[in-house]
Amino acid sequence: LVQTSIEFVIGSAGCTDPNAGNYVPNAAIDDGSCIDNAQLDFDTEVTNTGSNHTVYIPADVIFPEGVDFNLEEDFLGAFYLSNGYPILGSDMVFDESINDGSFQVVIFGDDTSTPDPDGFYNGQEFIWAFQDSNSGNSLFLSPTYQNPTSSNSYLDDGIFAVESFDILYGLTGCMNSD
């Protein structure tokens, strides 16, 4: 009797749907973890209104499983709702003198001297999102802040620090198309 045992690795598991928000291009096995693409516009020109709220993202921030954040290529941003649509209201800012992988997200407040909203109102909730640079797909995130008294809302001259992000599986809001 002769027995032979062969072991081989097919590849990593992950979301194999290229239209999903958490698509993993090198995944060989679909693990059923696909999340709808939020289809957010990270190319929007963000206006520096002179009012801001800074959110520090440390190098050791924890992203959800399946989100492989690449600091030099991917995008992380805070959106606000304007007429029911999410609008990018932040910029990722890097300090050239600090190379530990940390960065800041500067979130801009509304310029009240203009008629249209062009930033966050005081107390307006942040809608966090991640965009993968390779696929262009995006998904919503929910932050946990280092200070438990920090809210997830805009505060003029506010400073928060994020400890981790989780995937936000749905964004609720007005469903009336009129």
Q: What role is predicted for each listed range?
A:
Residues 1-178:
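Primarily marks secretory-pathway-exposed extracellular/lumenal segments that are disulfide-
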